[in-house]
Amino acid sequence: MYFILSDKLMKRIYLPIMLWALICCTENKKNTESTEVSQEASKESKKASDTKEQIKAKPKTGSTDGMIHFDGGSIIIGSESGMPDEQPPFEKIIEPFYLDKNLVTVGDFRKFIQATGFKTDADKFGDSGVFDFEQGNWNLMKGANWEYPLGPQMPKAEENHPVTHVSWNDAQAYATWAGKRLPTEFEWEYAAKNGKNTTDKYAWGNQLIVKGRYMANVWQGESVTEPEVLDGFMLTSPVGAFGEHPSGLTDMGGNVWQWCANTYAGYPGSPTAGQKDEAVKSARGGSFMYDQAEDASFTTTFRSKNTTDTSLFNTGFRCAM
């Protein structure tokens, strides 16, 4: 059985796309490695169509309404004390850009689907990744998609919650339709740090709980099969429910993992620098889901990755310009 989302019971699951740090605790037919969950189409008919062919409506000219502007400049990316793939830190010049204040919601994504007739990867495959809290493993749930995150037999997703069960391909298609794009993970980190070389761990400061209040929708519980609901949400929460960060952004830690534009690769100077697979993209931010990295997954520097056709119930995105 799956814990049902209610606006007062929604809580966590980790699997960064997001499974860079978690997935070793489950066996999933989507896994291509112990740290990735991927969907492999068994028939040619299941392969993703070209995004341009799927988007029937003419892409809009992007609007910066609801976006935060960042001036850009020099920033130190990564962490000396973080996970191996966050090292070594290096200087990066970021050009000026805009980033959505909020995650793309179910309501936002519905407008895209209605305007274009787009079919997501989850709909093409007929299933998507959902975590079974009782059994303690990931499953491909038939019929789970952006509209029915726990399957068609369960309630629809709330319109003001972040859209989930969207692959990198799906996020790219939405961004193109909206006249925007996905942020690079370096832009994402710059924004999470509010453009400053700060020592703060998170986008809001150094503590997950401030004056008795949780600052983000994050996992509470001793293990992945023993969730507690101390922040008010069992699974996803409405976008912005935990307030704005100093940058003006919301949900830059927890709630859902966020797809980034770039291919995942080792940082300059690392043993894996230059090694990459174009089918594996970066993701940032952590989610409501349990993570073996624990609180580290919500930091501004933590990295995750997954394949472009993977969709999960704790993965979403926001757009940039």
Where would I find each of the regions flagged by the language model?
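Low-complexity, intrinsically disordered short segments enriched for Gly/Pro and polybasic residues
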Residues: 1, 16, 224, 306-309
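Positively charged n-region of N-terminal signal peptides that target proteins for export
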Residues: 2-13
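Short alpha-helical segments used as structural interaction elements across diverse proteins
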Residues: 8-9, 281, 300, 315
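Short, surface-exposed loop and linker segments with low hydrophobicity and enrichment for Pro/Ser/Thr
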Residues: 14, 94-97, 275-276
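Mature extracytoplasmic/luminal segments of secretory-pathway proteins
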Residues: 21-22, 202, 257, 316
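Functional-site microenvironments in short loops/helix caps that host divalent-cation chemistry
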Residues: 70, 76, 81, 119, ...
